């Protein structure tokens, strides 16, 4: 197990590709401990150290799963004696029609909109509330 007590720690959602993936690489290069969260299991082609041991698979559209992830993040932080210096809620969804067109509020099912709001609005609030103590302790 790696000793992270003397490094800053960031939790980053939506880390498996795009902006999230680039953000992980940047913070890792700067010496931060990066706890990644995404719907996918850790991809072995991701080039940062401690990747698999600091990855949490979580479905942000599922409130219960978010709660489980918060508990796991807190456990990992506590186990290593470190605080949380930053939380980046990068994950987000913007579902489209098959042709790439935007969804219409009247025609799109409420189930889809609930998932969009859960991932884009409620999950970040749940993560911030759940990790507030750790963020405050580290002045994050």
Residue ranges and their predicted role:
Residues 16-17:
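Conserved glycine-rich cofactor-binding loop
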Residues 50-64:
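Rossmann-fold cofactor-recognition segment
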Residues 98-105, 109-114:
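Substrate-binding pocket helix/loop in short-chain dehydrogenase/reductase
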Residues 128-129:
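A short, exposed helix-loop element centered on a Lys and neighboring polar residues
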């Amino acid at each position: 197990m790696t000793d992270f007590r003397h490094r800053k720690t960031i939790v980053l959602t939506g880390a498996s590709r795009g902006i999230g993936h680039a953000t992980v690489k940047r913070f890792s290069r700067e010496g931060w401990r990066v706890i990644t969260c995404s719907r996918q299991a850790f991809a072995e082609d991701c080039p940062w150290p401690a990747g698999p041991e600091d990855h949490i698979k979580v479905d942000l559209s599922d409130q219960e799963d978010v709660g489980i992830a918060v508990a796991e993040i807190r456990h990992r932080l506590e186990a290593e004696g470190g605080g949380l210096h930053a939380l980046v809620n990068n994950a987000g969804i913007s579902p489209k029609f098959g042709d790439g067109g935007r969804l219409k509020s009247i025609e799109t099912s409420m189930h889809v909109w609930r998932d969009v709001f859960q991932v884009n609005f409620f999950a970040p609030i749940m993560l911030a509330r759940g990790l507030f103590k750790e963020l405050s302790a580290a002045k994050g």
